[in-house]
Amino acid sequence: MNRLTPTRSISNPTLGDVTRAMVEFAHKGKQDLEVRRLCEIICEDLAQGDYAGECLAIYYWVCQNIRYMRDIHDVEFVKEPARVLETRSGDCDDMATLLAAMLMAMGNRCDFVLASFNGAAVPSHVYVRVYSPKGPIVLDPVANRDTGKMLGELTSASTVPV
């Protein structure tokens, strides 16, 4: 990975533009051997077959190792998982894309959950729902950073299959 690892800048983005880029990058990331190897390292001490434990271990790794950083005002950047790992930073869509790629690299199915807060009609946040053998698990690396007050009261949520 280097400074030329792709990032997509979207001017005047629609929600569809952003989610399409996220889905594309998550599928590309799940096939990245560095992403897979990192997941193997993160999960190496877990019991074989502890798939829910793998999901949580990967989630906690993202929470502890990727810094939340907002995009430039009025410019939407969507980073490929390799770029997020390289910079160790990203906003909610970057962190969700990396998390989904890592979870899918370990054989899990995921959705992106698009959320609106405080009565807003347009989603302003995204997180991941992963389907483990024990059932769906909601994973939000941004909310894990005590930003629940920043996010406000959930108005609505919709899903985009990855």
Where are these regions (language model features)?
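A structural boundary/capping signal
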Residues: 1-162
